Amino acid sequence: LADAYFDELRSVLGDNARAQHMELTSFSHIDDLIADAGDFDGFISIGPSVLSSDRLLKLHLVLPYGVFIDINPAPSLFDSVQPDLSQTILDALDMLVSSGKRRIGYIGGTGFTMGLYEYPEDGRLTAFRNWTERLGLDAEGLIYAQGAFTVDTGRTLGEEAVNDHRDDMPDAFIVAADSIAVGVLQAFTAAGVLVPRDTSVISINNQAIAQYTSPTLTSYDIDQNELADTAITMLAEAISSRRTLHHHTFISTTLVVRDSFVPAR
């Protein structure tokens, strides 16, 4: 499930590129792209891999026009298109608070915020810490964030949350991704914690699996077609204009309501 999101995004990017008569060649390693850079006008990168600053600098020297989708590892070197996950976290908190929920936890994996430095904290968690403090929400002891973005991680962290709060479960949890949320729901069900009766769950990504969990998963949809189309347009414009300033675009998300959380009307 963790890889499915990026697999789907690659497929959507390929479809959009063909529709715009753009030829794509796939590379799995940055060094291979650096070696063959003379054959290309630009690149689009997909995936969560941490790329070292020295490799990114070398790539920029040989291929200065590039767009990163979903991450922004080198804002001063390349363009980027990302889902607006900080706003998504704020929207989720606002939705939960409007539904009378004040004790809100977070479950997620470990990621990197990159630039000249690497910070070992996923941007969704950074946004959650920021917005809960600004909104005056008590998240003390309600944050579980470690490991990969997998079902196993969700199951492990879900079990930890139940063990810590069996008698005082938070009103709701925001989960960083559907792949983790699947494991969280499994852990809650095994422990007799009923969603949404005992706690609500909101996730992010709206992968196909969200329709088939028990309960079905309320999740923020990331429009992959919009990400891909924007990236292609951005790259084509950068190449044609030979601009040196870099553009960074955020795409909004949309809540798809299912059974794990139904907002108050």
Which residues fall in each region the model found?
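Periplasmic-binding protein-like
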Residues: D39-G47, G105-G108, Y144, R166-A177, ...
